[in-house]
Amino acid sequence: MIISAASDYRAAAQRTLPPFLFHYIDGGAYAEYTLRRNVEDLSQVALRQRVLKNMSDLSLETTLFNETLSMPVALAPVGLCGMYARRGEVQAAAAADAKGIPFTLSTVSVCPIEEVAPTLKRPMWFQLYVLRDRGFMRNALERAKAAGCSTLVFTVDMPTPGARYRDAHSGMSGPNAAMRRYWQAVMHPKWAWDVGLNGRPHDLGNISAYLGKPTGLEDYIGWLANNFDPSISWKDLEWIREFWDGPMVIKGILDPEDARDAVRFGADGIVVSNHGGRQLDGVLSSARALPAIADAVKGDIAILADSGIRNGLDVVRMIALGADTVLLGRAYLYALATAGKAGVANLLDLIEKEMKVAMTLTGAKSISEISGDSLVQELGRSLPAALAPMSKGDAA
């Protein structure tokens, strides 16, 4: 299969992966309206084309939390990454490291902190959920500090798991799930050999290190379901802020008032995110939510954004809407499932190329020159038609 664009990796991943894994990452919550709008809304953001600007000195380099990034992109935390390629977290992290951008390890990664961190030249980031078991949270934070992780990404939009209907149909959950997954693996021999057999152990490394025993897929589902904490509040985060010495980023912000609360709390950054449309269907896409949040807190806190970003043009759009940096999730996982480290490396090269084309044709020589002025105002920052709040009957 020819890979000429980031979107090609999705089709390739669907061929490679057993359905329960493909649909787990590809799907969203409920009827998946927000999942689709994340992509659709961002695609409607119109950029101003500018010409004759002498773009010979164009640079994508930027600085975030005292780290130099080759471009304003980081790899987002994605659970079960090691089920998509053999020791997938190690491979994805290596590609990000070689590109000069951060990799974020998920709490529920297959490969533990101690396996991934020593393979990298630059410090990785670590993501943590709000969980009832505070002992696990402290243990994970201690291990992340010991491994030299620089930035903590604290996910707050998952006090309870979203209703993901695709999972029951695909075999990730539902009746006879284990038998269905086994049969799917048999029907996908490339994955079964590379990951199913040679990618073991298939436990959740960060959790296994704490519990002292392997945790398989069923254990993962059960343990997480019993440990998400709906009682969490800003006050419960104070001990984490005191414990963690480095930058702390709050992930899962969609409302300007929550963004202001993050500033008052003392966070170093926020991620404007709806969890890739995987938590609550019907909420704003990140592209819809970002401009108002940027108006509220830009300059007071670093603004990152995810959800719906599929290519370099989308990165430029998000920055023009108010983000400082973006996180890639599904896009890099499709590439990882297709070709491992080489796939992620090629994806990042494609995104870099697409960003350079977009910046050259909009007259932005540097990341700091991408702003609201880069947008066609009728379809730009105000976005009265494309990105106005959804009205009744407006669902796609």
Swiss-Prot record:
Membrane-topology descriptor: Peripheral membrane protein
InterPro entries: Aldolase_TIM, Alpha-hydoxy_acid_DH_FMN, FMN-dep_DH, FMN_HAD, FMN_hydac_DH_AS, LldD
The entry's keywords: Cell inner membrane, Cell membrane, Flavoprotein, FMN, Membrane, Oxidoreductase
Binding site for substrate: 24, 129, 164, 278
Molecular function, one GO term: L-lactate dehydrogenase activity
The UniProt record lists the keyword Transferase: no
Domain FMN hydroxy acid dehydrogenase: 1-380
Cofactor names: FMN
A biological process from GO: lactate metabolic process
UniProt-annotated catalytic positions: 275 (proton acceptor)
Uppermost EC category: oxidoreductase
PROSITE patterns xrefs: FMN_HYDROXY_ACID_DH_1, FMN_HYDROXY_ACID_DH_2
Binding positions for FMN per the UniProt entry: 106, 127, 155, 251, 306-330
EC number(s) per entry: 1.1.-.-
Coiled-coil residue windows: none
Family classification: Belongs to the FMN-dependent alpha-hydroxy acid dehydrogenase family.
PANTHER family per the UniProt record, alphabetical: L-LACTATE DEHYDROGENASE (PTHR10578:SF85), S -2-HYDROXY-ACID OXIDASE-RELATED (PTHR10578)
Name of this chain's protein: L-lactate dehydrogenase
Species the sequence originates in: Salmonella schwarzengrund (strain CVM19633)
Species classification: Bacteria, Pseudomonadati, Pseudomonadota, Gammaproteobacteria, Enterobacterales
